[in-house]
């Protein structure tokens, strides 16, 4: 017999991802693949040497059985022999199935439905046999180090409703890897903690960076493990691609996939639906924050109901039996839940689960202090500080969502005077927090400074263009604008501030938190249609185009009605403005505009939301004054979103 030559070790190939292989669909082998991206699930690519198929898999063996890391040696049989074995195996399986079905037909005790089911099973078994014959792989010989990814359960795993009898402990490896968890903790302290102020920074550092026990809880406590995994998950989602490669030498998607599965596994073990620990709820809320950042679907909007119910069951806002430390932790957590409830309700759109009273008058916000001012043993009250503190942005968010609820979800706030008064109160409270704040001192100070300016413009815009649909009533009169200010200018200021965060290096750590809000974008688009100031439109249109493209790329999946409405508006305005803008200012300034794709496919437009055959109101209002035209345009946008009596939508929070 001819002697076999030395075998060359195969290079790792990019194979079908785990989910496509389990679903038995063709994978395009991208990272992430198209199937997983369209399904909204995590794609975990598989890179390993190709393994033999069919009958060859039975001859797979290792050079050294004692060494699991030893390279794989493969004996190759002839293709003809492999085909014969596969055909014989397939025929034998089908023969047994047919015999079983025939014997069941002869039984008088088997129903026709059961026979039908077994016939279906026979066909399915035959198909599965063909697939398994061509793709049979020894699972124990896989060379990938990560665990298997199962199809997404939509978030039910963390609630203990996924039907899994034993959590996959392999996913906890990202937490047990101390170097990785320490790196992710540092990312959390830089990117997440300043804007989502839930935890006590010194206690977190002592636990995850110095190895001490967390708040006296025993090691291995389910609540502590779930919190650690949630911190890693939200930190991973806050990374930019550049930061991911610099810190972990891999893609962001791979880090996020590992961290998310570890978080869901540990949360399932801690049972957030039944746990009386505030720590478990902290982990659950951080999971929702991270999930919302990477997943634009309505999953987080649905899961928010659990978070709100659990928080109320724990009597979170009051916490009268706790010491000062416990009260601050409860208030911070409730504030984060209120903010997340407000944000998720806007993106659908729908009514918030938490009422205006529960979020404002019945709740006193946490202290404006630094984390270093108190510790778990502090029992006395600590007064507020002046200047920028660790909780400044968190308190700004509290005032933002409070003003947003009053202006958009409170039926009693209708007249111009009360709306303007709420805006003034909001400006006074937020600008007071900026006293002695130097925006050039730190990235956090810079981000807080510019976001507050964005929020102030949003509050003024919301007072002028409220989101309450009038349903045939009289529109709210337009407030007098300050000199040099217009509705379009306010909307542009918001869009420019968002773009600034995504382009300035100082905003890199906070880009995950800032997306393009749809309301200023819709107002800017409609105002460009009717604005008579050509120079303002020429300045505004490239900003609007860039914001629209960014919105479509990041949050377009959150609400079909919003996406369709914005796309329809853009098609209308592009058709009117592009010829005149190109004649007036051809060249580089309009490169972004001319390169932007224009989609007018009828199948993408829901007839209940917008009719392709019916013109916009703004197209037929030439006889009206500019103010009436502007209001008519906004009414058309709101009407297109609320054809189903839902009521309201986004204000100015992304």
UniProtKB/Swiss-Prot annotation:
Residues 17-43 bind DNA. The keyword Transcription applies. Keywords: DNA-binding, Metal-binding, Nucleus, Transcription, Transcription regulation, Zinc. GO terms for molecular function: DNA binding; DNA-binding transcription factor activity, RNA polymerase II-specific; zinc ion binding. This is C6 finger domain transcription factor nscR. Transcription factor that specifically regulates the neosartoricin B biosynthesis gene cluster. One of its GO terms (cellular component) is nucleus.
